[in-house]
């Protein structure tokens, strides 16, 4: 692909959808994410139903996070040197098998053969397997997108990609909870497997693209090249660091149940609206960005978005009104979605085709760890300094990180997207 190709004139917001492969790619991502998010909710429900132990829920996340983060760099190396369509077929088939095993162990017939005490360890093992697949999934999909669309459409492809992910992340848990409540665990797993199968079918509509990276040195040196590239690129390292620290300090969403029950007194119904507010803000903003792109001066807009994200967190922490809190959570999701689009576009634009898997793997290690640790940080600070001060502290630190980044990268705020591509800063 020509690395000098960049935006010369505006394309319509639907331009990227004219590419059949991208439509198949988008369908694959949506249906897989839908099934994945359904399954995440259902596994949590089922494990807690069997154990009545909150620690067991924490172990579910740990069983997935450890292999996903641990294998990320190797997954990026494999993604770079492999044909992406074939790799994704193997990854999705592995997830399909893990889900099938969980379906089998939850059927009433199997309860006569498998003691209840064995079911939870089997679930943990299957979640561990899905975590391994996740370590290959992110770098493979990131690398593939660059092979199916021209470079000038990267900003729009990132917007559509993130929008479909957000939409699936909202609808998946909602559908999972409803189906589980009305029809039970087994039927829910049948639905999950159906959606995974649909995503598998979408892969068959993708063309086979030869890898752009042929390793000529040891695997250790190849992996090191990906890490070194990120740390030498000022803008890419800054974008990843901003994401890491904003998620780490801005993980106040983990404290929503405390606000719903103890501060706003709105109960579980209000909690549902609070969780939906941020996601709704993100989805609507992403849809707007398919028409009005934030990529005029991306680095400046990224810093503004992160600052707005931190400010909305502070205000949400101080709010005593339920409806004002919903507005602030909506704004938090909106600002976050802007930063997501800009970061993903910068990554697509600055990463050489033969290093996309490894660079995506480094990004996954940054982000994959920050979500879990951010939730832990919010819980720990809430215990040490109480809930409201903890949220205000997190938002303040997010703004501080954005301010420090601005001082260190002031020269980047004036660059347009085309200038960033030309300078590859």
Where are these regions (language model features)?
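Hydrophobic core of transmembrane alpha-helices in multi-pass small-molecule transporters
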Residues: 30, 114-136, 244, 312, ...
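Cytoplasmic helix-loop-helix junction between adjacent transmembrane helices
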Residues: 126-167
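Helix-loop boundary and gating motifs at the non-cytosolic
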Residues: 7-67, 228, 232-278
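Intracellular juxtamembrane helix-capping segments at the cytosolic ends
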Residues: 43, 136-149, 338-351
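Helix-loop junctions on the cytosolic side of multi-pass membrane transporters
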Residues: 143, 147, 189, 193-218, ...
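Helix-loop-helix hairpin linking two adjacent transmembrane segments in secondary transporters
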Residues: 117-119, 166-202
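C-terminal transmembrane bundle of multi-pass solute transporters/carriers
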Residues: 70-74, 81, 85-97, 101, ...
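Loop-to-transmembrane helix entry/capping segments in MFS-fold secondary transporters
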Residues: 54-55, 151-161, 268, 353-363
């Amino acid at each position: 692909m020509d690395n000098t190709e960049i935006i010369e004139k505006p394309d319509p917001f639907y331009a990227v959808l004219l590419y059949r492969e991208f439509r198949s790619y988008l369908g694959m991502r949506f249906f897989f994410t839908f099934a994945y998010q359904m399954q995440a909710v259902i596994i949590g429900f089922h494990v807690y139903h069997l154990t009545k132990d909150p620690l067991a829920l924490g172990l579910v996340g740990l069983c997935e996070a450890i292999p996903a983060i641990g294998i990320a760099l190797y997954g990026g190396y494999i993604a770079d040197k492999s044909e992406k369509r074939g790799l994704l077929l193997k990854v999705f088939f592995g997830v399909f098998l893990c889900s099938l095993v969980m379906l089998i162990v939850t059927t009433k017939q199997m309860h006569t053969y498998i003691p209840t005490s064995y079911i939870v360890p089997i679930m943990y093992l299957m979640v561990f397997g899905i975590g391994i697949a996740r370590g290959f999934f992110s770098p493979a999909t990131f690398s593939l997108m660059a092979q199916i669309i021209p470079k000038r459409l990267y900003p729009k492809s990132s917007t559509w990609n993130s929008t479909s992910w957000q939409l699936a992340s909202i609808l998946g848990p909602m559908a999972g909870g409803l189906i589980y409540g009305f029809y039970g665990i087994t039927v829910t797993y049948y639905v999950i497997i159906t959606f995974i199968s649909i995503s598998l079918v979408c892969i068959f509509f993708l063309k086979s693209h030869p890898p752009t990276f042929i390793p000529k040195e040891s695997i250790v040196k190849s992996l090191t090249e990906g890490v070194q590239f990120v740390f030498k690129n000022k803008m890419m390292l800054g974008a990843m660091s901003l994401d890491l620290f904003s998620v780490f300090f801005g993980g106040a969403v983990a404290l929503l149940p405390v606000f719903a029950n103890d501060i706003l007194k709105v109960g579980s119904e209000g909690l549902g609206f609070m969780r939906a507010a941020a996601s709704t803000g993100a989805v609507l903003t992403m849809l707007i960005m398919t028409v009005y792109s934030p990529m005029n001066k991306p680095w400046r807009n990224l810093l503004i978005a992160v600052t707005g994200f931190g400010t909305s967190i502070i205000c949400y922490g101080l709010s005593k009104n339920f409806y004002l809190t919903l507005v602030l959570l909506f704004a938090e999701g909106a600002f976050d979605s802007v930063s997501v689009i800009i970061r993903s576009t910068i990554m697509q634009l600055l990463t050489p085709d033969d290093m996309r898997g490894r660079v995506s793997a480094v990004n996954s290690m940054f982000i994959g760890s920050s979500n879990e640790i951010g939730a832990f940080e919010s819980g720990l600070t809430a215990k040490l300094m109480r809930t409201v001060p903890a949220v205000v502290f997190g938002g303040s630190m997010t703004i501080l990180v954005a301010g420090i980044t601005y001082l260190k990268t002031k020269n980047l705020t004036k660059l347009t997207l085309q200038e960033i591509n030309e300078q590859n800063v």
